[in-house]
Amino acid sequence: AWPTIIGPGIPKAQLKLHYQQEFLVYVRDFPVLLARVHGQNPPSDVRRMLAENIYEEDTGGLSFGRSHPELFNEMMRGLGFDGETFRRTKLLPASARYRAWLEKVTASRDWVVGAAALAVFVEGSIKDRQEIQAPSKPKTETEIEAYIDAHPLIRHHGIDRQHMDLIRAHQKVEAGHRQDAYTMVVNYAETRSQQNAVLACVTKGLALWMAYRDSVAKACKLKKA
């Protein structure tokens, strides 16, 4: 159903339900979840990478001076959804199961499992392999603005560009974060036990994430494209 969610035909009421679940499952508390992994006291170089990510997520200190949850809410205001829309919603059952898993893995006694869940799985994308094998250069302002112009919320829903700083922030800082994510997990999942735990973690995460996305699509009454 993802092509429908990012396509021109989805009504705003359905789009709102999708974003409500995204916000409560991980967007609102993502800096806190990262901090839970940092609090497991990984090696100093990993703490530095996590701290930089937390700093950006919680303050926007590397981009626009506002936390990513705040920037998300700003983007939602551009769609006509106020903050109360997200405060008063409830998680769907599958969304709650995925969120509970995120809380469990970030409290793992082995920090590398939590790092794999958040930095590799949640923040990752289909482009990760390409990014790791051939790291992209930081995008220029012109390239970022071209990306904004092509964004589905601009093209299909008429959101004003001034509300899109969350997407700008992602384009500005995410390339470096992808390198950090794989560095910390690949370099420190040294034992067979750790490697198996990481694989089990992301496999479980994928199953829960797919069930979560399917439940949102069902609640939105969407059909597979």
Placement of each model-derived feature along the sequence:
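Active-site-proximal alpha-helical scaffolds that flank and shape metal-associated catalytic sites
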Residues: 48, 55-163, 207, 217-222
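Alpha-helical scaffold segments that form or flank carboxylate-/histidine-based iron centers
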Residues: 12-22, 42-64, 114-121, 162-172, ...
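Alpha-helical bundle segments that constitute or directly flank the non-heme di-iron/ferroxidase center
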Residues: 6, 10-42, 60, 113-133, ...
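Acidic, low-complexity proline/glycine-rich segments
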Residues: 1-2
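Sequence termini and other peripheral, non-core segments
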Residues: 13, 17, 91, 222-225
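Amphipathic alpha-helical segments within well-ordered protein domains
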Residues: 34-38, 73, 77, 151-152, ...
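Acidic, carboxylate-rich catalytic segments that either coordinate divalent cations
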Residues: 177, 187-225
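Long amphipathic all-alpha helical oligomerization modules
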Residues: 162-194
